[in-house]
């Protein structure tokens, strides 16, 4: 199944942050290279655990988009919208994308080359490799049993998981 990815590929140099979609594309390619199964639901959980890792170990966040508490765990809506068409199928490597950095009407198809620096790639790889030890169902269960999701989740509502919930959780583990 081929996926059309729309991406404003950039890094916020001052904050050292990336878009969640940039991180998602990198994870997808890393998983394909390592022969790890990657579905969109698994990708969402991995992104959540990477953000937790950065809050705990680095003291900052890796991507600036909000994480929301959905019934099946933490979700980044921008990533969900791009990858949901895969349903429970494996995501193919991301080889090209539609560059929207100059606006919607000036998009160009470009070869995907990650803008993530090597230090961040190493940290991301570490978390992805740790997550590989667990099934997607287990990752969902783990994330739903952590206080950030528990505090934010309300049935039949979509609510943001504030970074302060992640910080509070990380300070207590």
Per-segment meaning from a language model:
Residues 1-173:
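Domain-edge interaction signal
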